[in-house]
């Protein structure tokens, strides 16, 4: 099976040793996105909701670069530095996804890169 790198300048460049996404067959593995502005590579200003919207927009750019849409996402992992934001995260997610929703995990963690409050990665299947 061949694999190819998915890359777009509409999402933040990698800040480590990883690709924005990798396609293997019809499956695309999305690397974690934090709320960095793709133009400045700075963390977006604002509250948890502003950060979450930026993360979804970053993921959307990579998904579209892969030739897909959020309807193709089958698994989403959400990493939160504070589970008190769980309900707000659900509300934000509802703006981007319709039923049937992807499988999902919401995971509490002590900290995230660049002081972000939220990070997401996922898997989509094309075709």
UniProtKB/Swiss-Prot annotation:
The organism's place on the tree of life at top rank: Bacteria
Stored Gene3D superfamilies: RutC-like
InterPro entries referenced in this protein's UniProt entry, alphabetically: RidA (IPR006056), RidA_CS (IPR019897), RutC-like_sf (IPR035959), YjgF/YER057c/UK114 (IPR006175)
Family statement: Belongs to the RutC family.
Pfam families: Ribonuc_L-PSP (PF01042)
Source organism per UniProt: Azotobacter vinelandii
One GO CC annotation: cytosol
Name of this protein: RutC family protein in vnfA 5'region
Gene Ontology molecular function, alphabetical: deaminase activity
